[in-house]
Amino acid sequence: MEKRDFHVVADTGIHARPATLLVQTASKFNSDVNLEYKGKSVNLKSIMGVMSLGVGQGADVTISAEGADEADAINAIEETMKKEGLSE
């Protein structure tokens, strides 16, 4: 299992558009990918799950992946988060 912590810096947090991009990125991989915030974990391949967390600016989140391509999944998600200005 791979895990990585992120600090959300975007003014709007993880709202609909970046959430969609994160879900699309996670969905490219066979690994189980989860987003954890405030003790609640959701499937990062589910837009409804991601939106239900209400991740705002300044939030600390953990993304984990488990499976054959877990490292690639985490790296791709980190790249998406940085590219979209969600984290540094």
Curated annotation (Swiss-Prot):
General (non sugar-specific) component of the phosphoenolpyruvate-dependent sugar phosphotransferase system (sugar PTS). This major carbohydrate active-transport system catalyzes the phosphorylation of incoming sugar substrates concomitantly with their translocation across the cell membrane. The phosphoryl group from phosphoenolpyruvate (PEP) is transferred to the phosphoryl carrier protein HPr by enzyme I. Phospho-HPr then transfers it to the PTS EIIA domain. Phosphorylation on Ser-46 inhibits the phosphoryl transfer from enzyme I to HPr. Keywords: Cytoplasm, Phosphoprotein, Phosphotransferase system, Sugar transport, Transcription, Transcription regulation, Transport. One of its GO terms (cellular component) is cytoplasm. Residues 1-88 form the HPr domain. The keyword Nucleotidyltransferase does not apply. GO terms for biological process: phosphoenolpyruvate-dependent sugar phosphotransferase system. It comes from the Bacteria. The active site is at H15 (pros-phosphohistidine intermediate). It is found in: Cytoplasm. Its main location: cytoplasm. The modification Phosphoserine is found at S46. The keyword Chloroplast does not apply. This is Phosphocarrier protein HPr. Belongs to the HPr family. It comes from Latilactobacillus sakei (Lactobacillus sakei). Coiled coil: none annotated.
